[in-house]
Swiss-Prot record:
<dbReference type="Pfam" id="PF01774">
    <property type="entry name" value="UreD"/>
</dbReference>
<dbReference type="GO" id="GO:0016151">
    <property type="term" value="F:nickel cation binding"/>
</dbReference>
<protein>
    <recommendedName>
        <fullName>Urease accessory protein UreD</fullName>
    </recommendedName>
</protein>
<comment type="function">
    <text>Required for maturation of urease via the functional incorporation of the urease nickel metallocenter.</text>
</comment>
<keyword id="KW-0143">Chaperone</keyword>
<comment type="similarity">
    <text>Belongs to the UreD family.</text>
</comment>
<comment type="subunit">
    <text>UreD, UreF and UreG form a complex that acts as a GTP-hydrolysis-dependent molecular chaperone, activating the urease apoprotein by helping to assemble the nickel containing metallocenter of UreC. The UreE protein probably delivers the nickel.</text>
</comment>
<keyword id="KW-0963">Cytoplasm</keyword>
<dbReference type="InterPro" id="IPR002669">
    <property type="entry name" value="UreD"/>
</dbReference>
<dbReference type="GO" id="GO:0005737">
    <property type="term" value="C:cytoplasm"/>
</dbReference>
<keyword id="KW-0996">Nickel insertion</keyword>
Amino acid sequence: MQTATRLERMHGHLALDFTLKQQRTRLTVREHRPPLQVVRDFGLADGTSFVHLHNVAGGVLAGDQLTTTIKLAASTKAQLTTTSSTRIYRSDGEQIAYQQVQATLAEQSLLEYWPDTTIPFAESLYQQQTRIDLAADAGLCWWEFLAPGREAYGERFAYRQLRLDCDIYALGRPILLDRMRLQPSLQQLSNPLYFGKYSYLATGYICRVGWDAVQWKALEAELMAFAASQTKLGRCLWGVSCLAAHGLVIRGLSSNSRDLLATAFDYWRFAKQALYGTTPNLPRKIY
């Protein structure tokens, strides 16, 4: 019983610093407190540092407060992924499972974030806050994937509340303030105004500071054409929209998670070719 109580209130912290050494990005784990840790870090052929992030508790429990801080030095490139889905366990009271991510990208750096799906269990309460700061010519590919619950156990939108906030700043000014509040008991998420027949949600943010509005509109049109080709009513829906400056947002709804994960990478394939003239490294979870 004492162990369970202790697990319910973990204050985990992971601080990652990426620096450039001999034209390759190197990771320094400045701080780590359980349950957060780095399982593996290795270099890719183009000098990118590829990192697996792991929660040894298997998920986020009610009362947990977990913080991840990411700093990229100038001209570094990092790709982050998770070792498994993020499970949000049930709350027997009013304690919220909480995660915070803060990322700071220096000039000409590039961060790619490819997590597994977040799965909120029945009766769970979850809050996630993300803030990303971009310097001049910094680039970003950031995705979030959300499941309706444990469908194999008959859980679909059975959680109590889910809050997802994401703020992106470029050159000190906000370009995205994204707020999502899902409360199934009040919102009837199966209504067509919300998820309708679909169960899984993908949200992607693609940015590069310095591109002008004309360039972003051209990329938006290209990705919208791809979105139309991937939209299949009853199976998946996709949409793309420019931000106020320096980026765009992509959203997808699907009846399964596999379609979202694979198609998300295709969006980045188009975007990275346009933004950097290169082909992205395939996230290992899609192999």
